[in-house]
């Protein structure tokens, strides 16, 4: 989670094998991934927060978590008696937990297509 160089090394290997778009969720390791992508002409989708501002030419979009929505969903499920132990819950787009954040590099037609696909 903390080894920036490891993230760069792994991304270098992936790009050398033909990857041109990387999606990584690994805290500081992701910074190494972004560095590698920038050096090698690849693109990155950030995760958990808006990482576009790190390098909007390289990080073309991010999947942003709405942690407030996560907490509200969890508390509402608990209060309703619907949150059970030993069970995995799949939450995300439907509950407005995840949302895409785009850089200017993403064309409007792609943003619209994704928005239409995300409607639930």
What annotation goes with each model-predicted range?
Residues 1-120:
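A residue-level marker of the well-folded mature domains of exported/periplasmic proteins
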């Amino acid at each position: 989670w903390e080894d920036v160089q490891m993230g760069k090394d792994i991304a270098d290997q992936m790009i050398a094998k033909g990857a041109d778009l990387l999606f990584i969720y690994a805290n500081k390791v992701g910074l190494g991934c972004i560095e590698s992508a920038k050096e090698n002409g690849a693109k990155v989708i950030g995760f958990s927060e808006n990482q576009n501002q790190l390098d909007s030419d390289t990080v073309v979009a991010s999947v942003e978590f709405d942690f407030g929505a996560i907490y509200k969903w969890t508390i509402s499920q608990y209060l309703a008696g619907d949150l059970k132990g030993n069970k995995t819950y799949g939450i995300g787009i439907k509950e407005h937990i995840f949302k895409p954040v785009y850089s200017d590099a993403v064309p409007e037609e792609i943003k619209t297509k994704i928005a239409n696909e995300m409607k639930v």
